[in-house]
Amino acid sequence: MLTVVDGEIVEEYDEFINIGQALSPKIISLTGITNEMLAEEGRSEETVAIDLKKKLTEDTIMIAHNAQFDLSFIYFLLKRHYPDEAEDIVGNIQWLDTLTVLKDRMDYPHKLVDAVEHYGVEKVNFHRAIDDTKALYSVTQELKLERDDLEEYINIFGYNPKYGVGKFRFPFITYKPQYYHNRGKLPPNEILPKK
């Protein structure tokens, strides 16, 4: 997680959560994170939940690629430690889903790696959270330069009607079917209907 003030990165939050289980060889290969790293640097889930509760304040705009995943992950982590507060914590901040924005602006595929390539952003190591976060911040800056309408996407998550939203919907997010026609040609208020 990056804290950005006036366009400048002022803090990086990058923590491993040690859940007390060994990582699979696939995860180790994909991320480069080892069991030894978790043993030495990993923090408890409770400690990370405490940190997130402090960091996710009402003036937070959480930018994520496929934000439904990140929102669900953070919500359920917080719910295990703050069962009565979790929904308020994640519901009091604003969410910007860059996957929704990219589906309006560029042709398929829409993975973060594709956005990085499309916008010419430098990326060090995919599948490491802090590197993905820095790349996503750079992509978001490019999206803003391309068309200054990102505010219209706040708390709107697009989804493919063929597959639906999934099992869990958050009441503070507006879910809109997002079709693939007219990418890049119409502003979001015409592609994604207003809340």
Task: Place the predicted regions along the sequence by residue.
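Cysteine endopeptidase catalytic domains of the caspase/legumain-like
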Residues: K123-H127, D131, N155, K176
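Acidic, divalent-metal-coordinating active-site segment for phosphoryl/phosphodiester hydrolysis
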Residues: R128-E142
